[in-house]
Structure formats: structure tokens, C-alpha cells
């Protein structure tokens, strides 16, 4: 991507590389699967290092967190020297990714599962014997954020049509807040 920007010599803006409401792409193959036949080319810079999208703030009053993302809330608060207030809502979104149901796979998603049902694809975090997949076997929220959408897509493929996915609990600290935000939206009822 750096080579494309250097060759362009101008500022470059591009739309999101995924259909609205679907699981975000973090690899070129994800973009190809989601936008096949609708785009001319894909610039493949490798897997996204951060995984979850950007942190979005509202600064038109008290500093507000509109969407937790790849920069932990604690880091933003340390730089700004203030505690962020909650901002935005699913009923009146003011930033991307605020709809109640978003980042949704085809399979139903259940959260904070310790003992999965026999018909669920179990996605672990930390030590989770029997998990089909893991956001981070080491229990690292940074790794979980980087792997989230790729693992969600894999679990959806394994679950198949009408299937179910169960996610082990992920701590809310650091990037865990962004991971849990995306998981709650993936698990929300779809309208």
C-alpha cells in the first residue's frame, strides 16, 4: 500500500472494503469474497496488524467515545487527560459501526460462554480446552483484536448455514473493549 501511495503522489481516499453490516475484512481474500465482481483490483498489503477498526471520538462537547477501536480507550484518555464519556447510540448513530447489529456473520452468535452447546463452534480466549478456534490462546487482547474478524469468518464457515458460534469471555480492559463491542454487535438480533 505504501508503494501505491508513493506512486500516486496525492492524498488518496477509498471506501470501506466490505458490504455494510457484514464481518469486516482483514485480509485480501476477505475483500475478494465480499466484493467479488464489484471491484477491479485489490491492493494486498498483507493481514491487518490491528484487526479492529479505528477508535472514533466525538469532540463537539465533552470528549466522547463513539466507537472503541484499535487505540485503547485508556491510551486516548491518558493523552487527552480526561475520562471519555459514552457517546452515540444504536438508535441514533453518529459514527460508523454504531448500529446494534453490525459485523454480523451468517451464524447466530452467543457470548461469554464457558460451556458451549454440542452444536456450537466454540471460539476460545486464553486456556479453553476443546475450543475449535481461539482469538488468543495466550489470553492477549491485542492479539484477539488482530484476529477477531478472521476468526469470526472461520467460525462462520465451520458453523455453516443456520449454525451457531459461541465465544468465551474476553476481558473489557485495553483492546478487549473494542473486541467485546464488535462481538456484542455480531450477536445482536438482526432486523
Language-model regions, residue ranges each:
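Active-site-adjacent structural elements in enzyme catalytic cores
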Residues: 1-191
